């Protein structure tokens, strides 16, 4: 939904690296093309004990055995990752930029965000609290001396992050 996914098929594997804080992420300096950062996880180098941290939090199958059925879980760590992970915050911001490019009308932005992420229009109640969230976030951003256009985008990014964190989005398809 962020519009960042690279649909390039084939090519070399994407290397991972361990950061000083213990997180394992994509090794951006080793990429052949900047867009390779957004390739599907299928192209990540697979090692038994060296997996992308974000995927391991969300029940990535163990590479040391066959996986005929994926387990699902709900854990506090997943919620914390969804709220604070840099990658996910970047995706919410990219999602907001994608929506913002389409229209300036707040109601249409809300509807588009719901359609892109959840495949449906928001209910009246969802549309109402989404408008309230946008208005409140814009005011909060403006209080920090942010330019109005930036405040608008940051508020939309907050809405997009909220939609991406919804239970409905996590279980799409």
What feature does the model see in each segment?
Residues 1-117, 121, 158, 163-173:
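An acidic, gly/pro-interrupted, aromatic-rich
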Residues 7-12, 125, 143-149:
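Surface-exposed patches in mature extracellular/periplasmic domains of secreted proteins
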Residues 102-103, 137, 141:
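Short coil/turn helix-boundary motifs
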Residues 103, 107, 123-127, 149, ...:
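Alpha-helix N-cap/helix-initiation sites
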Residues 112, 129-132, 154, 158:
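Amphipathic alpha-helical interaction segments
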Residues 117, 129-139:
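Amphipathic alpha-helical segments that form the core helices of the histone-fold
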Residues 122-132, 173:
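Short hydrophobic alpha-helical segments that form membrane-spanning helices or hydrophobic packing faces
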Residues 140-165:
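Charge-dense polyanion-binding interfaces
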């Amino acid at each position: 939904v962020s519009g960042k996914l690279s649909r390039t098929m084939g090519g070399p594997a994407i290397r991972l690296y361990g950061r000083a804080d213990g997180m394992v992420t994509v090794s951006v300096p080793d990429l052949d093309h900047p867009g390779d950062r957004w390739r599907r996880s299928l192209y990540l180098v697979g090692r038994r004990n060296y997996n992308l941290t974000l995927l391991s939090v969300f029940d990535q199958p163990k590479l040391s055995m066959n996986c005929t059925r994926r387990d699902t879980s709900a854990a506090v760590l997943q919620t914390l990752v969804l709220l604070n992970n840099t990658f996910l915050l970047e995706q919410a911001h990219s999602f907001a930029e994608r929506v913002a490019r389409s229209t300036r009308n707040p109601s249409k932005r809300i509807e588009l965000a719901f359609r892109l992420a959840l495949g449906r229009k928001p209910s009246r109640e969802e549309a109402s609290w989404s408008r309230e969230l946008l208005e409140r976030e814009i005011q909060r951003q403006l209080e920090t001396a942010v330019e109005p256009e930036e405040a608008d985008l940051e508020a939309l990014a907050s809405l997009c992050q909220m939609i991406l964190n919804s239970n409905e989005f996590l279980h799409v398809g």
